[in-house]
């Protein structure tokens, strides 16, 4: 708390201190740009393990290298989640590692299978039935492969892409088939598994899948039907069906367009690209199907987004601390690195602490005051800000563990049986059981809910005038009787976080015995990954809504900084004009302090009033301190006393009218753009990047110009809807543009 005149706590108006003797500053950084020399020694401990932030930044720069032309290498051991995203969603080129050591493993494992077939040995998947029917025998391995694909092509898909006679309850394609990005990611991951040389397939098969992938031919794969037990059998069968050119298997082909591309039979698509179908040899149908590629694919794509959202949550928390004029002290190293050194908690605290470096709005030091000086004042921030490292930290740890686990899954052999090409041994196991992915997705989805819950709590505090340290109700930039700006967002975010809570429920507790009780336990990994994508969809809505609110709140804080300074100047001018002739300079300063305190108290409790009535009320509250102060003074004569008393009504009138005019002028200047498109920028430091990205790059303006004009031109003529502005932020989050900004903030 800033001290006025050495002894008296300076009043605050709308969460901002009225103190004309000094410029606002924090962390030793003044608005005039001068700052003390920075120390090079970090107060935070150095970790030998990579943090989630490390993974996030590394993945971003790796992803950028793929966008610049570097190929995603398929070698069975180095495929990253960034590589999966780049190839699946952004059409980065892939390259098979055809080095002698890699190809030799594939060739050797294939020779083991060929030798077993030639010798007539009984081997699972070569001469036996599948799963619970493994007690059957056949000496026709090629027909056995056809039978495998046939019984797995059970997905329910639209029979036509033509318009329907009856409007559907839900979109026929999205309700039944996977997005192309999921399928492309699965193709890539399956190639990466097969190239490890443990599945007994030919090199030509891996090349054929790569050729189809490069041609941007994407199988139409059913959204449902996998329990991720013996791998994602049915979804992967559609990739196998495309490889062989099954005319009943359809694919997406043709130029990209808004919405789905053209659906055509796989044989037609292959022919149009000059690609010959590849008949599958013995064991190869099983080699394609028996794996976790779809679970790992959707999990990888989901985690890429989840890591970004976890970083954005910390950015939002830093901005929320500024918008609520909170304190950086909640994130001090002593609290987290010394007293409770959980890795995730330390990471979250360090990141938020660093983001608040150089802030103007948040306090950076603690000043002790006497009990009498801070009656009714919170000595610490509320839980959503103060305990955010403790709340976010475990989520960062869980997402990091999931990230590592799914990365490992993308570089594993998930097949059965497994072939050791060096010894000729065939191993029967269960690497297709995708519980590693399930656990990763369950903890990620729960973490996403907790992140959403924290941001929702911050958001509701920010729009509530009883908790937001002097901001107007619903962050209305104009008179609140005709401006309910964020009320709809407040309701919407409650819907979002409620849905996140529902989605956070575990999927794996619903496992059912399947396939003649052979798959008595299964992972449901793909279902869990799909649910996690749904959570990401919802959380992205909440984050974009909160970012929109944060930018509005920061603009209002900037406006109030000017308003507070102006009100103080008005009070000083009017008091000097009316009372300087009857009181001493020291007495005038003491009187000014009491009047400022009364003005602050009034403004902090009258935010729901329109400006004229609010300023009139503020002015009226100065009567008692003025009267009490003047009656306690020993004035030189009755004339002086009379002058002082009759001047009180004039002071009130002038203060109310001038403060009303000042607030109106500031509102007009801010909403019309006269203060610039990003008026809060001078008050921000590291968080300025995301604020200016929203305001300048995305063109999301401060809200309230329609309200200021009393809707003279109607709705939507001068301003887009609130939802349209939030949609711009949402699109930037989902298409990767915001990710670049987030990385730059932490770099």
From Swiss-Prot:
This is Phenylalanine ammonia-lyase 2. It is found in: Cytoplasm. The keyword Cytoplasm applies. There is a cross-link at residues 229-231 (5-imidazolinone (Ala-Gly)). (E)-cinnamate binds at residues 290, 380, 386, 416, 487, 515, 518. Its EC number is 4.3.1.24. Keywords: Cytoplasm, Lyase, Phenylalanine catabolism, Phenylpropanoid metabolism. The gene is PAL2. Residues 1-47 are annotated as: Disordered. Pfam families: Lyase_aromatic.
């Amino acid at each position: 708390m800033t001290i006025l005149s050495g002894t008296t706590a300076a009043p605050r108006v709308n969460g901002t201190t009225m103190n004309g003797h000094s410029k606002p500053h924090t962390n030793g950084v003044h608005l005039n740009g001068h700052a003390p020399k920075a120390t090079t020694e970090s107060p935070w401990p150095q970790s030998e393990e990579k943090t989630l932030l490390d993974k996030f930044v590394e993945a971003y720069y790796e992803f950028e290298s793929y966008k610049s032309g570097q190929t995603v290498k398929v070698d069975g051991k180095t495929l990253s989640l960034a590589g999966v995203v780049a190839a699946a969603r952004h059409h980065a080129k892939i390259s098979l590692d055809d080095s002698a050591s890699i190809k030799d493993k594939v060739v050797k494992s294939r020779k083991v299978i060929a030798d077993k077939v030639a010798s007539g040995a009984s081997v699972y998947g070569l001469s036996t039935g599948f799963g619970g029917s493994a007690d059957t025998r056949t000496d026709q391995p090629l027909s056995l492969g056809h039978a495998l694909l046939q019984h797995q092509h059970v997905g329910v898909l639209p029979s036509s892409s033509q318009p329907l006679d009856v409007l559907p309850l839900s979109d026929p394609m999205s309700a039944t088939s996977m997005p192309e990005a999921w399928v492309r990611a699965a193709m890539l991951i399956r190639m990466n598994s097969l190239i490890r040389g443990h599945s007994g397939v030919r090199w030509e098969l891996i090349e054929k899948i790569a050729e189809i992938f490069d041609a941007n031919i994407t199988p139409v794969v059913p959204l449902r039907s996998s329990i991720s037990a013996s791998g994602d059998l049915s979804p992967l069968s559609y990739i196998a069906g495309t490889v062989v050119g099954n005319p009943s298997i359809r694919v997406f082909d043709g130029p990209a367009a808004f919405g789905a591309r053209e659906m055509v039979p796989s044989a037609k698509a292959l022919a149009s690209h000059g690609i010959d179908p590849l008949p599958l040899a013995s064991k190869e149908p099983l080699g394609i199907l028996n794996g976790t590629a779809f679970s790992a694919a959707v999990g990888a794509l989901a985690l890429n987004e989840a890591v970004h959202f976890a970083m954005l949550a910390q950015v939002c928390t830093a901005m929320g601390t500024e918008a609520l004029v909170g304190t950086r002290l909640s994130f001090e190293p002593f609290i987290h690195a010394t007293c409770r050194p959980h890795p995730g908690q330390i990471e979250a605290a360090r990141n938020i602490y660093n983001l608040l470096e150089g802030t103007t709005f948040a306090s950076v030091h603690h000043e002790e005051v006497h009990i009498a000086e801070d009656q009714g004042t919170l000595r610490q921030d509320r839980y959503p800000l103060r305990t955010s490292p403790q709340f976010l930290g475990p989520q960062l740890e869980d997402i990091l563990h999931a990230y590592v686990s799914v990365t490992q899954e993308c570089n594993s052999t998930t097949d059965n049986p497994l072939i050791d090409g060096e010894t000729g041994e065939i191993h029967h196991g269960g690497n297709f059981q995708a519980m590693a992915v399930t656990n990763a997705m369950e903890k990620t989805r729960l973490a996403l809910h907790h992140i959403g819950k924290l941001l929702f709590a911050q958001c509701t505090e920010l729009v509530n005038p009883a908790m937001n340290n002097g901001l107007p109700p619903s962050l209305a930039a104009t008179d609140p009787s005709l401006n309910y700006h964020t009320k709809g967002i407040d309701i919407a975010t409650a819907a979002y976080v409620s849905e996140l809570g529902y989605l956070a429920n575990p999927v794996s507790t619903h496992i059912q015995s399947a396939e003649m009780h052979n798959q008595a336990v299964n992972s449901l990994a793909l279902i869990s990954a799909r649910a996690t994508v749904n959570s990401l969809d919802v959380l992205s809505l909440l984050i974009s809504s909160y970012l929109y609110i944060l930018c509005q709140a920061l603009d209002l804080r900037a406006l109030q900084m000017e308003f507070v300074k102006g009100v103080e100047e008005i009070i000083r001018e009017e008091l000097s004009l009316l009372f300087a002739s009857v009181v001493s300079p020291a007495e005038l300063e003491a009187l000014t302090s009491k009047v400022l305190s009364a003005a602050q108290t009034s403004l902090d409790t009258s935010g729901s009033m329109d400006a004229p009535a609010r300023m009139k009320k503020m002015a009226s509250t100065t009567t008692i301190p003025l009267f009490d102060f003047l009656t306690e003074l020993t004035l030189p004569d009755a004339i002086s006393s009379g002058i002082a008393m009759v001047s009180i009504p004039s002071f009130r009138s002038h203060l109310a009218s001038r403060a009303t005019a000042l607030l109106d002028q500031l509102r007009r200047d801010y909403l019309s753009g006269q203060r610039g498109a990003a008026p809060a920028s001078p008050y921000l430091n590291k968080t300025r990047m995301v604020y200016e990205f929203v305001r300048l790059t995305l063109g999301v303006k401060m809200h309230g110009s329609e309200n200021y004009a009393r809707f003279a031109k109607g709705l939507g003529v001068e301003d887009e809807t609130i939802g349209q502005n939030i949609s711009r932020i949402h699109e930037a989050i989902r298409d990767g543009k915001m990710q670049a900004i987030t990385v730059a903030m932490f770099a």
